[in-house]
């Protein structure tokens, strides 16, 4: 009996340190796992920084925002675009009405944009895209926009025509009308211009002979009447 008790006591004493080591091993295992998670987070931050360099310092895109704007009206509203909307869009629509054609302008931020020109139901729509700040400004509101000939869009060209190569105005040439020659080539031979020919001024041709005959007939008639 004493021997059995001694064996049990030895087993109990030897089992306690083993359980303690096992518990210590279980506590020590999570530490390397937590360390690995920290390394993964650092790697993700490095990847995000490499994918978008300088994104923190970049100012957000701003676009003009007007839903319905008529020609000549000013658009005074702007909006800051999110990173998912990198385009400023301008939509111009031309539609026919009872009073003629009506043109409206719409502008805003968008995520995708493609320049198009199409006609839907008698309305022609023109869509333009740009990616710089306030680039979708109405053409009449921007004094820097120039027309293809070199003049500004909000004012007509000055006198003269702009040369396509030199970029300067070339005034039109003045052509003088050639005066008629004074040698009388276009005048009648026997008189001046705008006057009938013949000896009597202001009478048609042959009037002198007819007048003489008429006078003679009148004279003979008077003699016949007096003789009778």
Curated annotation (Swiss-Prot):
| Stretches assigned to the UPAR/Ly6 domain | 61-148
- Record PTM text: Glycosylation of Asn-76 is critical for cell surface localization. Sulfation of a Tyr in the N-terminal acidic region increases the affinity for LPL.
Region ranges (Important for interaction with LPL):
102-108
According to the record, what induces this protein's expression?
Answer: Induced by fasting.
One GO term under biological process is:
protein import
Asked if the Swiss-Prot or TrEMBL record annotates the protein with the keyword DNA repair, the reply is no
Keywords linked to the UniProt accession: Cell membrane, Disulfide bond, Glycoprotein, GPI-anchor, Hyperlipidemia, Lipid-binding, Lipoprotein, Membrane, Signal, Sulfation, Transport
Q: Which residue positions carry a glycan here?
A: 76
Deleted gene: phenotype:
Adult mice display chylomicronemia when kept on a normal chow diet, with milky-looking blood plasma due to marked accumulation of chylomicrons in the plasma. Their plasma triglyceride levels are generally above 1000 mg/dl and can be as high as 5000 mg/dl. Mice display decreased plasma levels of lipoprotein lipase LPL. Contrary to wild-type, LPL is not recruited to the apical surface of endothelial cell that faces the lumen of capillaries, but is mislocalized to the interstitial spaces surrounding myocytes and adipocytes.
Residues linked to a lipid group, GPI-anchor amidated glycine type: 198
Q: Where is this region: Important for LPL transport to the lumenal surface of endothelial cells?
A: 24-48
Kindly state the tissue distribution recorded for this protein. Answer: Detected in fat tissue. Detected on the luminal surface of capillary endothelial cells in heart, skeletal muscle and brown adipose tissue (at protein level). Detected in heart and brown adipose tissue. Expressed at lower levels in lung and liver.
One Gene Ontology molecular-function label: chylomicron binding
Q: What is this protein called?
A: Glycosylphosphatidylinositol-anchored high density lipoprotein-binding protein 1
Q: What species is given as this protein's source?
A: Mus musculus
